[in-house]
C-alpha cells in the first residue's frame, strides 16, 4: 500500500478574486462584518482591488446575488454577510432557514466556496458580540473558511 495523500487548504490569497455580499438591513452590524471580511483577505495577501462588494436590501436577497456572482465566473470565492435577529413573529425562522438553504445550494451547484457570515441571533446584543466584540468577528471567520476552501479545491 502506498502513502496516504492528504489535502489541506492553505491560508494565503494569491491573485484570488472575492465577492462580498452585504445585507443593508441591520447595517450597524453588517458593516462591521464587512470590515472583518476585508481585513481577513488583506491580511492573508489579498489586494483591495480584487474585492467586489455588493449590497443587497436584506439577508433574503443574498442567495440570488450569490448565484449571479457564482454564475459570472469572475470570482474565486463569495462571502455572504448579514444579520437576522429574532423578533416576535415567525419571520426570523423563515428568513434564516431559506437564506441558509439558498447559500448552501448555490455553493454545491457551482462548486464555489461561499462563506456563511449571516448572523442568526436571538438578540441585538448577541449580534453585536459576533460582529467584532466579545465573540470575534464572524465576517472574518466566514472569509478565512472561504480562503481555505479555495486553496483546498484548487489542489484537488
Curated annotation (Swiss-Prot):
Transferase found in the keyword field: yes
Gene Ontology cellular component list: cytosol; riboflavin synthase complex
Entry annotated with the keyword Signal: no
Reaction equations catalysed: (2S)-2-hydroxy-3-oxobutyl phosphate + 5-amino-6-(D-ribitylamino)uracil = 6,7-dimethyl-8-(1-D-ribityl)lumazine + phosphate + 2 H2O + H(+)
Recorded metabolic or biological pathway in which this protein acts: Cofactor biosynthesis; riboflavin biosynthesis; riboflavin from 2-hydroxy-3-oxobutyl phosphate and 5-amino-6-(D-ribitylamino)uracil: step 1/2
Binding, (2S)-2-hydroxy-3-oxobutyl phosphate: 88-89, 130
Pfam family, one: DMRL_synthase
Gene Ontology biological-process entries: riboflavin biosynthetic process
Class of this enzyme: transferase
UniProt-listed Enzyme Commission number(s): 2.5.1.78
Keywords, sorted A to Z: Riboflavin biosynthesis, Transferase
GO molecular function: 6,7-dimethyl-8-ribityllumazine synthase activity
List of residues binding 5-amino-6-(D-ribitylamino)uracil: 25, 59-61, 83-85, 116
Record InterPro entries: LS, LS/RS, LS/RS_sf
Family matches, as HAMAP family: Lumazine_synth
Chain's role: Catalyzes the formation of 6,7-dimethyl-8-ribityllumazine by condensation of 5-amino-6-(D-ribitylamino)uracil with 3,4-dihydroxy-2-butanone 4-phosphate. This is the penultimate step in the biosynthesis of riboflavin.
Family listed: Belongs to the DMRL synthase family.
This protein's name: 6,7-dimethyl-8-ribityllumazine synthase
Organism: Magnetococcus marinus (strain ATCC BAA-1437 / JCM 17883 / MC-1)
